Amino acid sequence: MTGGGKSGGKASGSKNAQSRSSKAGLAFPVGRVHRLLRKGNYAQRVGAGAPVYLAAVLEYLAAEILELAGNAARDNKKTRIIPRHLQLAIRNDEELNKLLGHVTIAQGGVLPNIHQNLLPKKTGKTAGGKNASQEM
């Protein structure tokens, strides 16, 4: 044996263990996504790049929703995001509303909306029309 000693091939190779999430520069867990893809019976085999890509997409969507919800919370002078802020963020964004159109958010409420027919009619005041009738 040229290697000598008790150290096998794995000990020297795993000196600096690095997760797949950190390799990809992601915060979402690539390993967990890979495990869920395998256990979910979506396909017989799962490629190595699929969980990385899916974790990146999920992280982007979460960041986008939290960004908009944070803006909604700040507009309401709050420092904590509540389900109402998530609802406002998703429903006011055209693409997110299309993606999550059939999703119900608990304690989210509804968007404030008054139909145009129910609003009071705006009367166009003209300077010559009203003054002429009152000058008699």
UniProtKB/Swiss-Prot annotation:
- Domain of life assignment: Eukaryota
Instruction: Keywords in alphabetical order, please.
Output: Acetylation, Chromosome, DNA damage, DNA repair, DNA-binding, Methylation, Nucleosome core, Nucleus, Phosphoprotein
Gene Ontology annotations of biological process type = DNA repair
Q: Where is this motif: [ST]-Q motif?
A: 133-134
Q: Does the keyword rRNA processing apply?
A: no
Q: Which InterPro entries match?
A: Histone-fold (IPR009072), Histone_H2A (IPR002119), Histone_H2A/H2B/H3 (IPR007125), Histone_H2A_C (IPR032454), Histone_H2A_CS (IPR032458)
Q: Where is the composition biased (Gly residues)?
A: 1-11
Q: Which GO terms describe its cellular component?
A: nucleosome; nucleus
Q: Where in the chain is the site Not ubiquitinated?
A: 121
Q: Where is this region: Disordered?
A: 1-24
Any one Pfam family match given in the protein's UniProt record, by short name? Histone_H2A_C
Q: Which residues carry this modification: Phosphoserine?
A: 133
SMART domains noted in UniProt: H2A
PTM summary: Phosphorylated to form H2AS128ph (gamma-H2A) in response to DNA double-strand breaks (DSBs) generated by exogenous genotoxic agents and by stalled replication forks. Phosphorylation is dependent on the DNA damage checkpoint kinases MEC1/ATR and TEL1/ATM, spreads on either side of a detected DSB site and may mark the surrounding chromatin for recruitment of proteins required for DNA damage signaling and repair. Gamma-H2A is removed from the DNA prior to the strand invasion-primer extension step of the repair process and subsequently dephosphorylated.
Residue(s) carrying N6-acetyllysine: 6, 10
Oligomeric state and partners? Answer: The nucleosome is a histone octamer containing two molecules each of H2A, H2B, H3 and H4 assembled in one H3-H4 heterotetramer and two H2A-H2B heterodimers. The octamer wraps approximately 147 bp of DNA.
Q: Which family does it belong to?
A: Belongs to the histone H2A family.
Q: What is known of its domains?
A: The [ST]-Q motif constitutes a recognition sequence for kinases from the PI3/PI4-kinase family.
Q: What does this protein do?
A: Core component of nucleosome which plays a central role in DNA double strand break (DSB) repair. Nucleosomes wrap and compact DNA into chromatin, limiting DNA accessibility to the cellular machineries which require DNA as a template. Histones thereby play a central role in transcription regulation, DNA repair, DNA replication and chromosomal stability. DNA accessibility is regulated via a complex set of post-translational modifications of histones, also called histone code, and nucleosome remodeling.
What further note is attached to this protein's record? In contrast to vertebrates and insects, its C-terminus is not monoubiquitinated.
Q: What is this protein called?
A: Histone H2A
Q: What is the lineage of its organism?
A: Eukaryota, Fungi, Dikarya, Ascomycota, Pezizomycotina
